[in-house]
A protein has these predicted regions:
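Catalytic machinery of carbohydrate-active enzymes
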Residues: 1-317
Length: 317
């Protein structure tokens, strides 16, 4: 069976789709999946063995210069690649107008998606041939698993979903024990105060456990350097690709993170993780997987380093 999956962004949403692929692969012999995904995240679907081809889309970049020659040529190439195959099923796991209009409607095959009451943008359901009522009152991973099971006609198993990518990143080398702190995210209100990060780093390094600080842009690099200054057993990592970052996560003792896509990557790699949430409720969209822990408060500033260390110490002993 050849299936086209539409899930273009964001990092967390793409990662949330992986357990559904595992379900489908185990239920359907010879399953082959092509995946339409934003170019910045194209590396992630490659990690799953069910995915045979990536169809990159660049809506975020194209909309900045929609009438340029480059955009027109890239759109033509994208559309040609998307329409090169006849699919047994086209599944829009995004459920947005942009995914339905720019991807689902163009793909060849019976189009499956959420019904109008099951998605944030009901207009998207107009582009689907088959529509499914799937409750919002469950984690996003479970919604996607149910969508795939109904679209591809297999019984959904009761076990917790399996991302099935961690084994690709585990190292057999002897490594000094370390933890990773994902200290940066896109929205200011989701950041944890830097003095709390510093206090936590001091507590962890006192146990002879190294702390590694990744970053993705210059602002995040500067923050990492501020957190590390004057402290021993702290490493500001170099700029890493997603694959390299996944290797770092997979071989860590544990992770502490703010609300970021990299927290979901940590969950997908079956790594113990403490995610810090302020006003955001993690029940339906938080990290999904084994050994995932949350600390919540009405404001990030109300979560203390003592609270985090108490939880983390149990994970790194």
């Amino acid at each position: 069976m050849k299936v086209c999956v539409i899930k273009t962004s964001s990092m967390g949403d793409i990662i949330h789709t992986l357990p559904a692929l595992t379900d489908a692969q185990r239920a359907i012999p010879n399953l082959s999946i092509d995946w339409v995904v934003e170019e910045n995240f194209a590396e992630i679907p490659h990690w799953h063995s069910a995915v045979k081809q990536i169809i990159p889309i660049a809506l975020r970049r194209w909309r900045k210069s929609p009438f340029s020659a480059q955009t027109k040529n890239e759109w033509k190439s994208y559309r040609s690649l998307l329409q090169a195959n006849q699919y047994d099923a086209v599944i829009d796991a995004q459920g947005l107008f942009k995914s339905a209009f720019f991807a689902t409607r163009l793909a060849n095959g019976i189009k499956h998606g959420y019904d109008r009451k099951s998605i944030r943008e009901p207009i998207a359901s107009l582009f689907y041939d088959k529509k499914y009522a799937i409750s919002y009152q469950q984690h996003a991973v479970e919604r996607i698993r149910q969508l795939f099971a109904q679209a591809l006609s297999y019984p959904l198993q009761k076990e917790k979903g399996d991302y099935d990518i961690a084994r690709h990143f585990i190292s057999t080398d002897s490594i000094e024990p370390y933890v990773i702190f994902f200290h940066s995210t896109t929205r200011d209100e989701k950041h944890w105060p830097e003095h709390e990060w510093r206090n936590l780093i001091e507590k962890v390094t006192a146990l002879s456990v190294q702390v590694r600080l990744p970053w993705g842009n210059e602002k995040e690099k500067t923050r990492a350097e501020r957190l590390a200054v004057g402290l021993s057993h702290v490493v500001v990592l170099p700029k890493l690709s997603l694959h390299e970052l996944a290797e770092q996560i997979a071989n860590a003792k544990a992770v502490v993170s703010v609300d970021t896509g990299l927290a979901h990557l940590t969950a997908a790699l079956d790594k113990p993780n403490i995610t810090l949430y302020g006003a955001t409720a993690p029940t339906l969209i938080g990290c999904y997987g084994q050994n995932q822990h949350y600390l919540t408060a009405n404001s990030m500033g109300n979560i203390t380093s003592d609270q985090v260390f108490s939880e983390l110490n149990l994970l790194i002993k």
